Amino acid sequence: STYTMTIDVTAVNDAPTANDDTINVVSGTPATGNVVTSNDTDPDGDTLSVSAIAGGSPGSPITGTYGTFTLDSDGSYTYTVDTSNADVIAWQSGDPPLTETFTYTASDGNGETNTATITVNVSGSNDAPTAADNTVTTNEDTDHTFSESEFGFSDVDGDSLDHVSIETLPSN
């Protein structure tokens, strides 16, 4: 005997895949990009968006440990380093990066979501030293050896004084 069987296949919405991201940023230069278009996918081809971010909401700045992070609903982001942060100021070339993380939720717009973590690696920069104006008085025809303290040298990075250039001297 012969049987006829009908099978109905109903498509279901599959969850998107939100992949972890790493952002490398240097103090003084904001980092920008897009966490959704860089590596997140949806098996159904749905357009993905950021529906949530831990500690805030899409489009609103979040103050992190080392800077401010803004993640918009389209996945675009900006991370700006807080150049007044003591750890950022103290960062030296060769030090490991300062790291903080943010977790976001990607949505396919049809009820399915997935989460991923954004790791931000912050590197400082070599900041210029400062010097304070100073007057040094010495007797005529007498040698004077300048000391570092007479130049009011200061460096937030902790670097030592390398050299000094005297550009003008008073005339008699």
Predicted regions and their residues:
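Short, tryptophan-glycine- and acidic/Ser/Thr-enriched carbohydrate-recognition patches
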Residues: 42-48
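Short, structured coil/turn linkers that connect adjacent secondary-structure elements
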Residues: 19, 39-40
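Flexible "stalk/tail and boundary" regions
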Residues: 49-62
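A short beta-strand segment in extracellular, disulfide-stabilized domains
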Residues: 30-37, 144-150
